Amino acid sequence: MNTRTQKYIAEVLGTFILVFFGCGTAMFTKANVVATSLAFGISIIVAAYTFGKISGAHLNPAVSFAMLVDGKMKTDEFIGYVISQVIGAFAATGILSILVACGALGKVWDVKKGKDITAGIGDSSFGANGFGNMNFFGALLVEIILTFIFVLVIINVTESEDEGTKKHAPIFIGIALTFVHLLGINLTGTSVNPARSLAPAIFAIGATDGSSIAQVWVFIVGPMVGAFIAALVNSILLRKKK
């Protein structure tokens, strides 16, 4: 097995872990802010320590895009990473949909319709993102800012000249993902990751009356713009010149 194939497999598995536990927790706790934030943060720590030495554990097209802009990836490798991340996200959401079909959200008998309906202990929207009470510009701005901060942290801790910081980079990245979720969940549900948003948006079409797929472009464009700005700011303003 060649190194590039191993990287792609690592990205599939790492993204699966992130989406399965992050979006799964959002579903089964009705998007409890603290629980969901911690689930995403801890998941990325676990995935980064597990797969970081193989692929760098991007687990996110926005992160890979920042690396492409920064000159750390070639275009063909970037495309392979993104495809792998999307596959991992869809696999995780697919498993969550099977759990829902098996009654993981509980079942309530609808007397009027005369059938079981999913209800009760969770939310069947698969952790899909949405505009909340904002318009598209507000949601887009939130995603750009949150992704900018998140990706800027990733670039700097993984490039740090301090060995202690670099060694524990997954922990800092996990903390960063946790705190952007603490703010963002009540605004957009927090994406900062196009793959994490695309899969739930498609699976949640029925539960959201189509709004999840109609709004998903914001959660693709916003994170990519935020990542681009982060790579640019780091390159121009923060990186030490040799």
Where are these regions (language model features)?
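Membrane-interface helix-loop junctions and terminal tails of multi-pass membrane proteins
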Residues: 1-242
